């Protein structure tokens, strides 16, 4: 059973007024044990059992069949994370850091990519960004950090999802949209000055090491 809501609870009984067993977040997977009314009975890796509302979860096969992995669906999911607080090392809909936002959004579409921005930067297709951003597409990842010099290579320290028109969504303080256009009200001068390059990842899922769907990942078998 896959949790499809950003946040919720699993309960001791098939009743939301009963004692919670744990909280759950989007993408959590629990073992199906049966159904009772509007609930799935599920079990945890440690043996605990609980009831999970069908309104916030789906059987894995049903969930996967309904999945969309196109750019617009992924961006829509990213927008649904707006306002979620920044949490260093966070990778859930309760709190994220910059690379955790990217990883969490993609995981909600059954896509697994490396955890850290410094790893995410070197998968897929590297794109040197044109001055007018004409070669960057919606859904590309944009990376920021220390620019390379003759003495040392670049240092990746931040990542966001490109939305088009020099706008990107990222986690810094919280999840929000910033602009790399000085004329925009949400202009982010700090990150614009340290923009490095973009990465196009979607065409390379299940074709390149480090980027796959859960049904192709041994850990989830």
Question: Where are the regions a protein language model picked out?
Answer:
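Surface-exposed beta-loop interaction hotspot
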Residues: 1-2, 6-8, 12, 46-86
């Amino acid at each position: 059973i896959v949790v499809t809501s950003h946040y919720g609870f699993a309960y001791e009984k098939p009743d939301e007024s009963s004692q919670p067993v744990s909280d759950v977040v989007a993408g959590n997977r629990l073992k199906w044990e049966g159904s009772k009314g509007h609930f799935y009975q599920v079990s945890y890796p440690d043996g605990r059992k609980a009831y999970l509302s069908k309104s916030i979860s789906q059987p894995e096969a049903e969930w996967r069949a309904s999945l969309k992995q196109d750019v617009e669906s992924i961006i829509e999911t990213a927008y649904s994370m707006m306002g979620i607080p920044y949490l260093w090392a966070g990778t859930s809909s309760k709190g994220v850091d910059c690379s955790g936002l990217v990883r969490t959004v993609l995981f909600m579409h059954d896509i697994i990519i490396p955890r850290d921005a410094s790893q995410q930067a070197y998968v897929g297709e590297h794109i040197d960004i044109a001055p007018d951003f004409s070669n960057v597409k919606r859904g590309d990842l944009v990376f920021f950090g220390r620019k390379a010099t003759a003495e040392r290579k670049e240092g990746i320290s931040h990542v966001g999802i490109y939305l088009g028109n020099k706008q990107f969504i990222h986690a810094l303080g919280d999840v929000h949209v910033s602009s790399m256009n000085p004329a925009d009200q949400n202009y982010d001068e700090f990150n614009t000055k340290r923009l490095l390059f973009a990465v196009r990842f979607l065409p390379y899922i299940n074709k390149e090491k480090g980027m796959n769907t859960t049904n192709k990942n041994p850990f989830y078998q």
